[in-house]
């Protein structure tokens, strides 16, 4: 997405001109590809006897981005939660794969995908829509032949049984203790289904919101690691949502014990339930967050656009994701049934076979390789 906003008409139109030109008519010179993508240079400038190495702005940025354990943790478990769809891949580019990209492949990808037939235009504010549409038509749409292929992200093929994976990350330290991450992830329903999205958000909030929440409390009080994983929570930006929880500061051999701790905690929620006051408080917080204007540090218009964009991207109804009142009323009724958490945890998590236990352990030799 390429968002911009301005309260000044002239500034807005100037930005629109620049964005339309940059997105649909990029020059993409080969020298720019070498600078921004990848190239081979001597490691010491001017020293022809120094070793050759890969360089490039994006290449170096992604090396930096993927140097953190949390980034590798997120990419690692995502690749197993989404084994066959586009979410399997690192959207910024895997540094190890960037050097295989050719200039011709980049041009082909750009011409195929950065095309008005694939574009979604969303606007908010007191705009002259006819004037705006005419600008889009004359400066972009009319200058291309329509493509008839629709690009879709298909639903992920579901596992028939849970899986466990262990991988390693580089850590430059002689002491590798208390540096392992264990995370469990589940693939849930469609993010374009507002009822399913709100239900999953409420379940996640009740389980993980604070130290009194059952799953967060179990992870915080466990001696299997130092603290809950930063990945704990619900991810709803992909076509299908995912729920994750886990622990950091652990040891590789604790993987099965962490998994059992999480499953036992979820089973206790199903068996014993959760205080209705906790559910009501979480629902109230969820409702406030959903209705909050500017609560995500964006202008209100961009906030609405980002909320509805997943439905537009996946050929759903963008307006439906903004019609909160009926969905919140349905959730309020369901959440007050007395068995909301039991039913939801059982259905979305315990009965869900598309589950991954992912362990990321330190290795002091990887960085040298």
What are these regions (language model features)?
Residues 164-170:
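Aromatic/basic-lined ligand-recognition segments
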Residues 1-158, 175-183, 188-194, 199, ...:
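Charge-rich, well-structured scaffold segments of protease-associated domains
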């Amino acid at each position: 997405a390429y968002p911009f906003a301005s309260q000044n008409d002239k500034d807005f139109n100037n930005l629109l001109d620049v964005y339309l030109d940059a997105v649909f008519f990029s020059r993409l010179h080969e020298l720019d590809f070498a600078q921004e993508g990848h190239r081979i240079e001597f490691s010491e400038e001017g020293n022809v006897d120094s070793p050759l190495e890969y360089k490039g702005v994006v290449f170096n940025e992604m090396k930096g981005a993927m140097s953190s354990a949390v980034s590798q943790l997120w990419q690692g478990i995502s690749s197993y939660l989404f084994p066959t769809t586009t979410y399997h891949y690192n959207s910024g580019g895997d540094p190890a794969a960037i050097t295989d990209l050719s200039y011709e492949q980049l041009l082909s990808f750009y011409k195929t995908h950065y095309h008005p037939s694939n574009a979604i235009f969303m606007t908010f504010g007191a705009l002259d829509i006819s004037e705006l549409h005419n600008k889009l038509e004359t400066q972009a749409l009319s200058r291309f032949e329509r493509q008839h292929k629709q690009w879709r992200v298909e639903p992920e093929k579901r596992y028939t049984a849970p899986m466990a994976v262990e991988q390693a990350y580089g850590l430059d330290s002689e002491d590798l203790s208390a540096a392992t991450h264990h995370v469990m992830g589940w693939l849930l329903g469609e993010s374009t289904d507002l009822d399913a999205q709100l239900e999953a958000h409420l379940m996640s909030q009740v389980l993980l919101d604070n130290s009194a929440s059952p799953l967060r409390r179990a992870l915080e009080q466990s001696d299997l690691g130092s603290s809950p994983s930063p990945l704990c929570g619900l991810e709803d930006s992909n076509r299908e949502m995912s729920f994750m929880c886990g622990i950091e500061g652990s040891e590789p051999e604790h993987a099965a014990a962490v998994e059992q701790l999480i499953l036992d905690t979820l089973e206790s929620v199903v068996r014993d339930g959760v205080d209705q006051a906790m559910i009501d408080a979480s629902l109230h917080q969820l409702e406030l967050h959903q209705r909050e204007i500017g609560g995500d540090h964006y202008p209100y218009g961009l906030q609405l656009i980002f909320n509805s964009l997943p439905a537009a991207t996946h050929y759903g109804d963008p307006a439906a994701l903004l019609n909160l009142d009926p969905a919140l009323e349905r959730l309020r009724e369901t959440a007050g049934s007395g068995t909301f958490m039991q039913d939801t945890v059982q259905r979305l998590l315990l009965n869900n076979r598309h589950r991954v236990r992912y362990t990321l352990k330190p290795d002091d030799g990887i960085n040298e390789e």
